[in-house]
Amino acid sequence: MVVSVKVFKKATPNGKVTFYLGRRDFIDHIDYCDPVDGVIVVEPDYLKNRKVFGQLATTYRYGREEDEVMGVKFSKELILCREQIVPMTNPNMEMTPMQEKLVRKLGSNAYPFTFHFPPNSPSSVTLQQEGDDNGKPLGVEYTIRAFVGDSEDDRQHKRSMVSLVIKKLQYAPLNRGQRLPSSLVSKGFTFSNGKISLEVTLDREIYYHGEKTAATVQVSNNSKKSVKSIKCFIVQHTEITMVNAQFSKHVAQLETKEGCPITPGANLTKTFYLIPLAANNKDRHGIALDGHLKDEDVNLASSTMVQEGKSTGDACGIVISYSVRIKLNCGTLGGEMQTDVPFKLLQPAPGTIEKKRSNAMKKMKSIEQHRNVKGYYQDDDDNIVFEDFAKMRMNNVNMAD
C-alpha cells in the first residue's frame, strides 16, 4: 500500500511565486513548538535582481471591525519573525524530509524556509460571529506571507505577495493522569435548620474533543427543603487579555427531574453525560473555536496549557478554560445552589489511539470530498498530493451562499 502525503499550495495573483506547505496545523508542545517549514518556488527570470522575503505574523483582533471609527483600531498585528528566502542566506540549512522531497520534485527554483514561533506565543482562537456579521472574526490568527522586493521594508504589492493562514494548536499530554476532579458544597437556609450537600466528581481531568464528560452527582438533603430539578452544563470560559474582559458560554446542557423531588432526609446519586461539540453551537455568538466554523475539522477552542510552574494568568492572547456546572433548584424560597468542577478539553496527543482514529477519519473524508475536485491532483512518482490552499473553505463559502 502506497501512502500519499498531502501538500498545500498557494500562488501569488500573478502566478510567479508559489508557497508549498506540508501542513496547516502546528503544535505547541508547551516546552517547544513545531517550526513552520515549507518551500517557495519562483519562476525563472522573474526576480530581476530582486529578492523574496518571508514573514510569520499574528493578528490579535479584540473588537469588531465595524466599530473602528475615528482612527481607533481594535486589532494588533505583530511580525514574529522575518527572513530573506530568495536568494538563500544559508545555503547549507538543514531541511526536513518533506522539504527535501519537495525540493527534489520542484527543481532548482524551489527554496526551503523555516520560521519559529516565539516562546509563550498564544494559540489560534476564533470567536464565533453573529450571523449577519461579515467582518473579520475576533481572535488570534497566524499568517505566513512572502513578497517580492528590494528590501524587507519595501511596500508589499498584492500582485506579487502570497499569504496563508495557519493554526497553532496545543495537544494533550500522552498521560492523562489519574486525578479525578471533584467539588463539594453545602447550603443552609435562613429560616430552617439543616443543609443540602452537593458533591460532583468527574471521571477524568483531561477530555478529548468529541468525548463524553461523565459527572457523578451526589445530593444529600438534610434540610427541610426539597430539590425540584437538576441542571447540568458544560461552560466555556473565555478571557481576552488585551482588554481584560471575561465571559462564559454554555456549550452543552441538560435539565432533568428524574429522581426529583429530593425530599428532606433523602439522597440521590446519578451520573450525567454531556458532549461539548462545535457542531451543536453553530448559531451561538461568542463561542471560541480553534478555527473557522466553515472548516470541516473545526473544534471548540482547546483549554489553554502553560508550562509547569506558571499559571494561565501569565498567558497572553485569548485564554480558554472549561468546567462542569451543576445547579440544584431548591424551590421558590430556597433558590438555587451550584458548583463548578474545572477540566481540560484538548486534542489527543500524536501517537495515541484516539489521534490515529481521528486522523484516519479525516483522511477518509478528505479523499471522498476531493476525489473529483479541480485543483487537487496526485503526483505518483513521489506520492505527493497537491491541494490548493484554502480551497476547501472557499467551497464551503460558495455552498453557503
UniProtKB/Swiss-Prot annotation:
Location in the cell: Cell projection, Rhabdomere
Record has Phosphoprotein as a keyword: yes
Keyword hit for Phosphoprotein: yes
Alphabetical UniProt keywords: Cell projection, Phosphoprotein, Sensory transduction, Vision
Tissues where this protein is expressed: Expressed in photoreceptor cells.
Main location: other
SMART domains: Arrestin_C
Pfam families: Arrestin_C (PF02752), Arrestin_N (PF00339)
Impact reported for V52D: In photoreceptors, leads to an equivalent distribution of per in the nuclei in both day and night ultimately resulting in a decrease in Bdbt foci development
This protein's GO CC annotations: cytoplasm; rhabdomere; subrhabdomeral cisterna
PTM section of the record: Phosphorylated upon light exposure.
Residues that bear Phosphoserine: S366
GO biological process assignments: desensitization of G protein-coupled receptor signaling pathway; G protein-coupled receptor internalization; negative regulation of opsin-mediated signaling pathway; negative regulation of phospholipase C-activating phototransduction signaling pathway; photoreceptor cell maintenance; sensory perception of smell; sensory perception of sound; signal transduction
Domain of life: Eukaryota
InterPro entries for the chain: Arrestin, Arrestin-like_C, Arrestin-like_N, Arrestin_C-like, Arrestin_CS, Arrestin_N, Ig_E-set
Gene Ontology terms for molecular function: G protein-coupled receptor binding; opsin binding
Described function: Regulates photoreceptor cell deactivation. Arr1 and Arr2 proteins are mediators of rhodopsin inactivation and are essential for the termination of the phototransduction cascade. Involved in regulating normal cycles of per nuclear accumulation in brain circadian neurons and thus is important for normal circadian behavior. In the dark, functions with Arr1 to promote the formation of cytosolic Bdbt foci, which are required for dco localization to photoreceptor nuclei where it phosphorylates and activates degradation of per.
UniProt record similarity statement: Belongs to the arrestin family.
Name of the molecule in the record: Phosrestin-1
Species of origin: Drosophila melanogaster (Fruit fly)
Lineage start: Eukaryota, Metazoa, Ecdysozoa, Arthropoda, Hexapoda
